[in-house]
A protein has these predicted regions:
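Short, cationic-aromatic polyanion-contact patches
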Residues: 42-47, 65, 98-120
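Basic amphipathic alpha-helical segments that dock to polyanions
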Residues: 69, 80-90
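A short alpha-helical element within helix-turn-helix/winged-helix DNA-binding domains
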Residues: 63-73
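Short helix-capping/hinge SLiMs at alpha-helix to coil transitions
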Residues: 55-61
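Amphipathic alpha-helical dimerization/coiled-coil segments
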Residues: 111-144
Length: 144
């Protein structure tokens, strides 16, 4: 019998060519695209503006409410919530006491934490795959 587990997380990592030159705004957009929440159809670049606003609030040591983000970014609270949910699903931001903030103290720390999440998920998958190998008596061999 197959159990229907609640989804604990979902990761979307897009492998994009690294930008040739250093540019703060382009680098922030690149990270947003790599995590799949900067959509090409988002002509107003709302997601990027939200992410940049959250980065600035992290620099100041604060989080922001959805209402504060809506005011700073200049879009509806509904649009803010839509993009925040995508960013939370990507693992980059969290909500604490009603305030949204980067998951780590910096973009790099946030990416490190997401990487550790991915490793934990892959280890669980590998463990089950190993059980299947054992059950089916399938050999595991390193690539030569």
């Amino acid at each position: 019998m197959v159990s229907r587990d609640k989804e604990l997380g979902r990761f979307l990592i897009i492998d994009l060519r690294r930008l040739p030159t250093k540019n703060l705004n382009e680098d922030i957009d690149w990270i947003a695209r790599c995590f799949g929440f900067l959509e090409t159809r988002d002509g107003a670049q709302t997601a990027a503006r939200i992410f940049k606003t959250l980065l600035n609030s992290t620099k100041e040591g604060d989080g922001l409410t959805s209402d504060e983000l809506a005011e700073k970014v200049g879009v509806t609270r509904g649009a803010i919530i839509h993009h925040l949910n995508k960013m939370m699903n990507s693992g980059l931001i969290i909500i604490q006491s009603g305030q949204y903030k980067l998951r780590g103290r910096s973009p790099r720390r946030t990416v490190v934490e997401v990487r550790l999440d991915l490793i934990r998920v892959l280890e669980k998958i590998e463990d089950i795959a190993s059980c299947i190998d054992d059950e089916l008596n399938l050999p595991y061999r390193e690539t030569q």
